[in-house]
Amino acid sequence: MAGVATPCANGCGPGAPSEAEVLHLCRSLEVGTVMTLFYSKKSQRPERKTFQVKLETRQITWSRGADKIEGSIDIREIKEIRPGKTSRDFDRYQEDPAFRPDQSHCFVILYGMEFRLKTLSLQATSEDEVNMWIKGLTWLMEDTLQAATPLQIERWLRKQFYSVDRNREDRISAKDLKNMLSQVNYRVPNMRFLRERLTDLEQRSGDITYGQFAQLYRSLMYSAQKTMDLPFLETNALRTGERPEHCQVSLSEFQQFLLEYQGELWAVDRLQVQEFMLSFLRDPLREIEEPYFFLDELVTFLFSKENSVWNSQLDAVCPDTMNNPLSHYWISSSHNTYLTGDQFSSESSLEAYARCLRMGCRCIELDCWDGPDGMPVIYHGHTLTTKIKFSDVLHTIKEHAFVASEYPVILSIEDHCSIAQQRNMAQHFRKVLGDTLLTKPVDIAADGLPSPNQLRRKILIKHKKLAEGSAYEEVPTSVMYSENDISNSIKNGILYLEDPVNHEWYPHYFVLTSSKIYYSEETSSDQGNEDEEEPKEASSSTELHSSEKWFHGKLGAGRDGRHIAERLLTEYCIETGAPDGSFLVRESETFVGDYTLSFWRNGKVQHCRIHSRQDAGTPKFFLTDNLVFDSLYDLITHYQQVPLRCNEFEMRLSEPVPQTNAHESKEWYHASLTRAQAEHMLMRVPRDGAFLVRKRNEPNSYAISFRAEGKIKHCRVQQEGQTVMLGNSEFDSLVDLISYYEKHPLYRKMKLRYPINEEALEKIGTAEPDYGALYEGRNPGFYVEANPMPTFKCAVKALFDYKAQREDELTFTKSAIIQNVEKQDGGWWRGDYGGKKQLWFPSNYVEEMINPAVLEPEREHLDENSPLGDLLRGVLDVPACQIAIRPEGKNNRLFVFSISMPSVAQWSLDVAADSQEELQDWVKKIREVAQTADARLTEGKMMERRKKIALELSELVVYCRPVPFDEEKIGTERACYRDMSSFPETKAEKYVNKAKGKKFLQYNRLQLSRIYPKGQRLDSSNYDPLPMWICGSQLVALNFQTPDKPMQMNQALFMAGGHCGYVLQPSTMRDEAFDPFDKSSLRGLEPCVICIEVLGARHLPKNGRGIVCPFVEIEVAGAEYDSTKQKTEFVVDNGLNPVWPAKPFHFQISNPEFAFLRFVVYEEDMFSDQNFLAQATFPVKGLKTGYRAVPLKNNYSEDLELASLLIKIDIFPAKENGDLSPFSGISLRERASDASSQLFHVRAREGSFEARYQQPFEDFRISQEHLADHFDSRERSTSDGPSSATNLIEDPLHDKLWKCSL
């Protein structure tokens, strides 16, 4: 998420270096110094390397020598430069006498684009060297971020070019250029496309220089986007085809554009416009009185951050708005601040506190438990999360609390400590925090909370407080016992379940409560381990070559192998334009044990023998006797870096030629298998991830048949020359493709896991096929919609949030479990959720869960309120279970016990532990629970937890005194502004609604409230904060480490005021008549209409291997009555410079003071699923109008390099008579209901279907007219229900993806 601490936090500002000093620093850093790098991996010892700054690309690089760069980081990603040894990398060597560097000789660079930052921990040779690096990098951080967009583009272009031209020869091949453009999201159809645009290539080599590359980029960006409806482009010579550098936009024309189209009042000053143009261009040849833009430069300006839709003047803190009581502000708040991942097994980290505080968070949480040596530790109690020292946390808070903001920090203490350790806590609070700790009221006579200005640079303690005159006493908590709270579990931890298909054991998180055993989906057993483990080495270094794409094994007998190698190299190099040095390695046909290196040079294939010999019983490999290698892999790696030398030439091995037919020997490949046969095989393996690959009848075409979400699906793979295509993702071979999707999801969360053939079926196949895996029956020659099988009840899991549009529909959140689902035709199903029975919901919002009655009897007990929340896989009723230890173990696991249920015949669950002690403890506790379950549950529900508070700690609590929420006190004299209440989201939802929202807002005008995620969110997901905010809750605590929409909304809310962590709530919310859920209660606010056209985008990020097909979702989020979404069409295969057809989107907003405009860029993948690419979210009150850039961010709200949308935006006031200008008489909400612009679902009306055929699934052609007739005949079973909806995946069985539009 966007780090808000500017580089000045590290020392720039009044003490910034002079121009001469900057020049000296930059030269010194460019030359570089030798420093010792401390690794994050335990297996790597510290090493001395040369570190340099590449000013052309603004990167820090390191290497052992001058030849090869081993690593680099972008300076734009640096968040903090920290002097000293404060990093985990240094901590690992505290006890190692060989590595005890002087504190003053060390510094740490923290960088990254996620919440959890990476570290570069360095030891310099002197303190002066450290100061040089810190001072120089601090200046470079600020200068890099503030650089004008054309200069940023120049640096980006050089970074891309040098990533290929590693030897700095100022030339790359056409093949390299094609691959590079693919990496930046631009599809090059063929090599001829490049040759036509690079007419001045060197005749002999065909290489491309940097200048040619930069000119090609400029041409590609402009030519693709010159069709956009923009000022200047309509009338200039561009339309006649004249090159953009021959068309100029003068200073006067640009000034007129800023005034007329952009509404920039500062542009009335001609001198300011001139200065702006000069600073943007930074072109010495145009530092003249009348600067000008070329047309392509003007378009670049429109996409630039300098033309942002956000009013940057709102980024500054306004002290005049910081004089209200704290209860009038939204305050940026974190939940379980110490965690870096999930809530049950991730690492607790000091860096999480530093990161949150530097992001402007002003309320952080300390979860304190008794620790060793009389001092508390902080972690998520009764879980596997790691522990950190309370005292270390306080020192971290002191160091980082006021870097990003000077406004007060609230420490929310979750206290589980004994009296003795509470006293030590209080002592450390005073000792470490000193004068920053608030220990007495600002104003004793006040009748409300103090203001942020009154509390500047103060730290407040939120903790329970004793009554007057008590030394210590028991105080009741407001939290009642809940079996669903993981902190009340009897035991929890990682146990292992055996996969019935491959018999591997996989970790799952188990929770034992007073009556049930809950266990999660497959998880990681080492999430708390920050260390990056080395990849597993091959069983023998001599076998490393066997998995390399350049190794082809034995190609043929005698001279056949030589001929085959020559054919493969010739075809590959001619077709792809591969450079000299392209190569493959094969087994020698003539010399047993030797190999042959075949390579491409000057349009011919040449061969070279690789000799082998035994040396002391180990093989050695060499081309010449004077340079011998331990393995074939080492030999090839060497000659990829160092040239082969002979009398005639010198040449490095460049590009490996991939194997083309290696798939034929793989267990998953079937050369002659029909679709029906493939489905029948997969029906006998009821496991997601089962797959096979089959040859299709069409030339150069294959299909992957697989199981996902309990259903069989297919996708087509196409061989195009030397490239294998899946959708728009390119691979070198089928083997490469399957290997990739064994590690990465192919469809939603499903990875290829179980290769299926006849031998596998004999071992793991069921006797009876699972016909439920097929969506529909088959009609020979034509796929039909009708399902001849009877419908059955099942459970489904929500993929997205859905809000009911009618009274007979369900409302649910993402990951909700909907029970007793009855599938209906027309895209709408019925089900039970949230106490509502058999209501409608769109089927494309959910994924079907495995039928619990078929595979896992314990799934019948699924509980949506389990302590595992969305991670839940199964539930067992402990009294109904029988436990038995298996002394002999099972399948390489020694410590195994079985859980069986007599009520379910022939069913048992084998569970493995890591040790005998762990096994015995689990079995003992489960048996105890089985005997006393009812008594334990009754005791827990009857018990009101009470807590003893130490006087020394109570005295530190001044304003934030947690007390049980009492609705009866609201608005009475008994309400005390110093008291506050905390609510889990589930309890808060009872007050942030139409019935009680106004009353809760009244409470929040005087007192603080803190909302936090429910305990079942073990995956650290977040709830929707908007209802809490509009009802006045100040401390809406979120998991900052989670990159989801709620956190992105949180970052948007606090972007005004420079991310200082305090935003004054609108004055409307302090109006006694205001009701958060009734727009008629709005007084003094003028409703508005926002009209937006999405014109184009630049530099969208990639998602996986393919070129993206992007579309843009536009959303207004805010008050319930204002929230709506619309979307554009998708653009095929272009993420570098896509253009959308002109289409206006209109949004009516009644409460613009509490409204956000949100853009999300998705790609549509081959399954018609949408995958997140980028987003940008802004408060509506800070938007500019005109032709504006929308700078895009990643899911952590970090700026994406050069990524932006270009939109045209207008904001109109509503007319007093209720009509909306300029569209009087017609509701814009109705206008916006055009089905092609609605997100996720469409209610299809009779006769309104128009099918769109998706090529990746075209196994058979069908009649569109027949299908349209078929759709028309489908109706919802009740006349008053929604008529139908469009499925994102309408027909997975038959590879048909249809979309319906009104």
Curated annotation (Swiss-Prot):
Pfam families: C2 (PF00168), EF_HAND_1_PLCG (PF23329), EF_HAND_2_PLCG (PF23583), PH (PF00169), PI-PLC-X (PF00388), PI-PLC-Y (PF00387), SH2 (PF00017), SH3_1 (PF00018)
EC category: hydrolase
Domain PI-PLC X-box intervals: 320-464
Active site: H335, H380
Post-translational modification: Tyrosine phosphorylated in response to signaling via activated FLT3, KIT and PDGFRA. Tyrosine phosphorylated by activated FGFR1, FGFR2, FGFR3 and FGFR4. Tyrosine phosphorylated by activated FLT1 and KDR. Tyrosine phosphorylated by activated PDGFRB. The receptor-mediated activation of PLCG1 involves its phosphorylation by tyrosine kinases in response to ligation of a variety of growth factor receptors and immune system receptors. For instance, SYK phosphorylates and activates PLCG1 in response to ligation of the B-cell receptor. Ubiquitinated by CBLB in activated T-cells.
Compartment list: Cell projection, Lamellipodium; Cell projection, Ruffle
Entry-linked SUPFAM superfamilies: C2 domain (Calcium/lipid-binding domain, CaLB), EF-hand, PH domain-like, PLC-like phosphodiesterases, SH2 domain, SH3-domain
Subunit description: Interacts (via SH2 domain) with FGFR1, FGFR2, FGFR3 and FGFR4 (phosphorylated). Interacts with RALGPS1. Interacts (via SH2 domains) with VIL1 (phosphorylated at C-terminus tyrosine phosphorylation sites). Interacts (via SH2 domain) with RET. Interacts with AGAP2 via its SH3 domain. Interacts with LAT (phosphorylated) upon TCR activation. Interacts (via SH3 domain) with the Pro-rich domain of TNK1. Associates with BLNK, VAV1, GRB2 and NCK1 in a B-cell antigen receptor-dependent fashion. Interacts with CBLB in activated T-cells; which inhibits phosphorylation. Interacts with SHB.
Official protein name in the record: 1-phosphatidylinositol 4,5-bisphosphate phosphodiesterase gamma-1
Organism: Mus musculus
